């Protein structure tokens, strides 16, 4: 009886044939819920009662479904998709997405989670039949933090092809498996697009047929490549075209007409900016001074392959992937770079393809399937292990624990945890046998080209032991950053074609011509974000009070769960204050991201992005060849979001994550006043120019001196922002008016600065 009631509830909500307006549907739903609740009183088992009530709540939280859509011949579709407002379900694990879409068919199950209406992230081919949502939730959590540097918030999708195991058992080759994965991928994307709004040529939002909506317009859906789907972007864009979706080939970035991450090497190059900063702050130039590296990955992969070619001073002594273990105890940087480059260009290469004559004495390539591996004296010395014979798992553990200068993650898997975490909590069963604790690592620096190489607690344990590390979200943000630039550029170019400012035939050549500039814009974000973390690290334990207040403020708003994010509670913070122990870089990275995300929301809902001064901010966001389309640019559908993203990043990068809320409280101003004051202060005192001059001193002066100069500029900027927000910004104020009022005096003061300040 109860199940029939649930089906009736679903039909009352979503069957188009039921007719009636929204109010009458809501009334019918209310009556059915009351009736079901009465029926539930008769359920004898507490467990059954709880399960049924959760199902009622689930149906109530569904906002759309394709269940009542049909194909051209009138048949029901062979797949079902439902869209759920996850935050309406009390029992879901944290963090709860804004929306999730579940897609089911006999041959595939998948889920797409996103944290806001404008969200982006990859779709992965999952091999975790029973807990792919857990996998995707962990990934989207990292994606949400990573996306602080771009316009959309985080999203992630994962699909499990259910017939794949049978194909493998039947002896199906790689091509047969790939074909089945593509079939599942197509169904998954169709399920997502079935219930997503569209935008017509007039700019009006249109809705899918036979879909009853219990929410507002929702037309923004973009996807990206991920594990197992690196070559699927053109397939996705073909499906987008079949649906007439407004984003066309901006739907899936990185296709044949787009910015290919592997060709650009953008993810690895971004991670390398982080690695270079770590070493630069240790006084070492890794582009010219040889340094030892161990890693996870192989040269055929995007992130590892590109990464291990970014310096000709690399001495890669050991690495492993899912097939082989590579050890070169004393590599020659020049010849080993040439060999890695050859392997990178070799299709589907593995470590077994490495020219053994190029490996130094005692080294070799060993299959992970071997029963045991005999170790040479050279291997024992470079990895600092005593055994003469070990199994592959022990050898891989030794590589992770090796006393190398850099440990670089470029492959799939979670290899480092904290002592208090269990392998089950980590959720990566395949690597349980080789996982180590963060405090045991002996590398000086960790570069996270890959996602989830360490747990957050593992990162913190490594940092507390003196290691230099950020987070995967900081280190490998360049891929998603590049994709976001591509989407926003394609939206602009589409508008330029529609307005007649650009010919359709010129589109693809224009996109290709901007590849290098897009790459440089993305890498600037990696440089700036890692610098922001370094400046906060320099603040030390003295910043703990303001950081604690910021976390309390976010927690009170329901925006931050410290336990979920691995941030210390008040008791642990008190202990750190007593010990003079500051937050670690991984913790600071999380605070930085939360500050940017929160500030973005505040700015985009304020009047600040509409200030005329920020028209040029928008123009500078795009590559130079697009400046001629400024009229279309100012009508860009995401204009305010792009400007708000730029401003939230600049404010937090230059002034710190706790600054925005402290400034608003102390100056008693709103967000718009703070933003205008910040931008005016930067321009009045020409602080951007000063900041860039300090950045130009990389490796020319000691890192400590460089940091001190940045801190001086930041202090001036914070003080002048406060003064302007408190004293000068009034209703109707503009950035240009503030600059005109105060810059002449500031320039005059600069001209005689030495004599005045002495």
Predicted segment positions?
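Non-transmembrane, aqueous-exposed alpha-helical and coiled segments at domain scale
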Residues: 167-172, 181-182, 186, 193-218, ...
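Extended, well-ordered protein cores
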Residues: 1-224, 233-238, 250-257
């Amino acid at each position: 009886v109860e199940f029939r009631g649930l089906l009736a509830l679903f039909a009352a909500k979503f069957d188009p044939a039921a007719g009636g307006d929204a109010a009458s549907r809501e009334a019918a739903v209310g009556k059915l819920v009351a009736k079901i609740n009465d029926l539930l009183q008769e359920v004898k088992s507490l467990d059954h009662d709880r399960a049924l009530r959760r199902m009622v709540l689930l149906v109530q939280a569904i906002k759309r479904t394709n269940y009542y859509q049909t194909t051209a011949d009138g048949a029901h579709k062979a797949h079902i998709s439902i869209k759920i407002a996850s935050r309406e379900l009390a029992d879901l694990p944290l963090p709860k997405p804004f929306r999730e879409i579940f897609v089911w068919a006999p041959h595939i199950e998948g889920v797409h989670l996103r944290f806001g209406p404008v969200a982006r992230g990859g779709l992965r081919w999952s091999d975790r039949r029973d807990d792919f949502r857990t996998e995707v939730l962990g990934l989207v959590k990292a994606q949400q933090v990573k996306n602080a540097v771009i316009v959309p918030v985080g999203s992630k999708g994962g699909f499990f092809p259910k017939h794949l195991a049978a194909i493998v058992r039947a002896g199906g080759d790689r091509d047969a498996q790939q074909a089945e994965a593509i079939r599942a991928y197509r169904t998954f994307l169709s399920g997502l697009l079935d219930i997503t709004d569209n935008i017509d040529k007039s700019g009006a939002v249109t809705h899918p047929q036979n879909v009853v909506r219990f929410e507002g317009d929702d037309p923004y859906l973009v996807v990206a490549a991920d594990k197992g789907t690196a070559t699927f972007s053109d397939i996705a864009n073909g499906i987008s075209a079949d649906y007439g979706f407004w984003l066309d080939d901006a739907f899936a970035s990185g296709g044949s007409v787009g910015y290919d991450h592997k060709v650009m090497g953008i993810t690895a190059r971004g991670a390398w900016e982080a690695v270079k900063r770590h070493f630069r702050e240790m006084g070492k130039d890794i582009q010219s001074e040889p340094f030892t590296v161990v890693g996870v990955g192989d040269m055929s992969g995007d992130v590892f392959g590109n990464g291990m070619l970014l310096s000709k001073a690399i001495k890669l002594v050991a690495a492993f992937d899912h097939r082989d273990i590579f050890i070169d105890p004393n590599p020659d940087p020049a010849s080993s770079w040439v060999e890695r480059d050859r392997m990178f260009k070799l299709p589907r290469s593995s470590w077994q393809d490495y020219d053994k004559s190029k490996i130094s004495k005692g080294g070799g390539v060993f299959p992970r399937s071997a029963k045991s591996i005999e170790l040479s004296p050279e291997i024992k010395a470079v990895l600092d292990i005593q055994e003469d014979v070990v199994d592959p798992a022990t050898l891989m553990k030794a590589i992770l624990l090796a006393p190398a200068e850099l440990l670089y993650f470029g492959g799939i898997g979670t290899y480092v945890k904290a002592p208090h975490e269990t392998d089950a909590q980590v959720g990566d069963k395949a690597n349980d046998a080789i996982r180590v604790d963060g405090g045991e690592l002996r590398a000086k620096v960790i570069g996270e080209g890959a996602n989830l190489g360490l747990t957050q607690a593992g990162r913190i344990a490594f940092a507390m032991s003196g290691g230099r590390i950020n987070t995967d979200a900081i280190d490998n943000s360049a891929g998603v950053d590049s994709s976001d630039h591509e989407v926003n550029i394609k939206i602009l170019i589409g508008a330029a074609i529609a307005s007649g400012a650009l010919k359709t035939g010129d589109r693809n050549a224009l996109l290709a011509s901007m590849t290098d500039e897009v790459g440089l814009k993305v890498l600037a974000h990696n440089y700036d974000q890692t610098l922001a973390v370094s400046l906060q690290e320099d603040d030390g334990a003295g910043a703990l009070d303001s950081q604690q207040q910021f976390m309390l403020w976010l927690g009170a708003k329901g925006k931050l769960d410290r336990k979920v994010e691995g941030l210390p509670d008040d008791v642990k913070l008190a202990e750190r204050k007593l010990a003079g122990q500051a937050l670690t870089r991984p913790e600071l990275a999380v605070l930085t991201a939360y500050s940017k995300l929160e500030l973005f929301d505040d700015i985009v809902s304020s009047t600040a992005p509409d200030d005329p001064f920020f028209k040029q901010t928008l123009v500078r966001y795009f590559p130079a060849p697009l400046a001629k389309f400024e009229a279309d640019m100012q009508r860009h559908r995401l204009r305010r979001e792009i400007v708000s993203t730029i401003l939230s990043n600049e404010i937090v990068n230059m002034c710190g994550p706790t600054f925005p809320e402290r400034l608003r409280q102390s100056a008693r101003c709103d967000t718009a006043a703070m933003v205008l004051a910040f931008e005016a202060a930067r321009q009045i005192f020409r602080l951007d120019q000063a900041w860039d001059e300090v950045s130009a001193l990389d490796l020319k002066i000691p890192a400590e001196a460089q940091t001190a100069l940045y801190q001086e500029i930041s202090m001036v900027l914070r003080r002048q922002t406060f003064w302007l927000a408190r004293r000068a910004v009034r209703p109707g104020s503009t950035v240009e008016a503030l600059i005109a009022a105060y810059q002449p005096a500031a320039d005059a003061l600069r001209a005689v600065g030495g004599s005045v300040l002495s």
